[in-house]
């Protein structure tokens, strides 16, 4: 398929320009795209996606405009092509096309997404909007980080459905000879052809247990057949998934009987249709299934500077380094003890979809003179991130939670922790050494000194005395807690950080394709989220009055 070209010659009597020009606000996303679509998304920008032979494609500039409007309005593919065919604003946004300009089928949008995903610059539409914002001076040296749940596009499966779907997937992925061998070891009276739950009297506990055991034995028999074999990629992936499902949800009891485990695996797969989705918690009381969408914004212009999608169980602090990859110097910081207090395990890190691969300078000389300032709520107040920001000489505006004070007793910050001297001094002026551990932290045990201490009742109820855990990043956390006691710091934090909440609200206003993912798989969800960020930036351009000018290329209209 060869590159199609967007027509620039308009029909004087049938163009949408004369009709929409006085009706569509210049500051709307339709007005912005109408004025700047040929500059932002020229057909040549997508030339690498097409060949030199074949029939002409739908002009990619038109497709890009439709994709952007589809994301901002939360349309499905079919709804989007219908809007382009019948809504004059959409043709007006695509350069002022004629009313009778032909539409196209919805599969063109899916084809364009696939071409972009297979290219070296899958997020080029977002990159273009960010580059325009930089050239207009809208991207400074402040970054506010936050995340939001993205509900997956599939149903969460229970254990029985998971195991049976895993078996079905393996049988489907296996070649004819291997499938015949696998089916020969199946013990249940089930051909595993139809999807869904197997037939069972689910009101009968004994029948449920028998079903779980039978499914588990079938799964284990299949895995034994695969053990030690060289498999092609589909069969290998299906076998690994089945082994994961059995291991995470089942326990083998006395007599080799399998039962559902009374626990939740740390990285539990929740669906065989989208194996990358995970259980997540935005707060202790708010759980969800799917992914997390992370964004970084410039708080002064409210332009989104970076996006990232991770599994739902990934911590916010673990993703911050990827969000700030274009702003922080490259450095190697071990991703251990993410919480930094010695009590929490490291979060699972996901791959970022970086914001800028256009080849343009990401920071002007003026921007580089100012230190980077990073804002975030307490989810970003982790030691590993604080260390990275300190190493980059960044201004740390991420909130750090105060130490826990069980039962109203002395919190950790009442103790003087001297990591240099390797000692801890309690409020009663008793000093004990820190016993280091392999993770880089340690513990300080006061032991028998607490027995005769007059402050013991205010400090601990443990018979063995108070013990203080020292995390690897204790010094960074202590400095951050001290800094955020400054009233000026608090005023700046309260005035700046909430802006990212409003931006997330703008992105999530449409449930379809906003809060609810339209596609399956982390890579596709990330590409969709990046496109949503691009559409949100374009809408912001209209509010700011961004226009094309000579010289730097872009400027904000004077207010």
What is each stretch, according to the model?
Residues 80-92:
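DNA-recognition alpha helix
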Residues 62-74:
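Alpha-helical support elements that line or immediately flank enzyme active sites
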Residues 49-56, 519-522:
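A short glycine/serine-rich beta->alpha loop
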Residues 73-81:
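Alpha-helix boundary/capping segments in eukaryotic regulatory proteins
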Residues 1-53:
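Basic, low-complexity segments
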Residues 79, 97-98, 102, 107-559:
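Anion-binding and metal-coordination hotspots
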Residues 37-44, 73, 296-300:
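Function-dense linear segments that define catalytic or interfacial modules
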Residues 3, 60-61:
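Double-stranded DNA-binding cores of transcription factors and transposases
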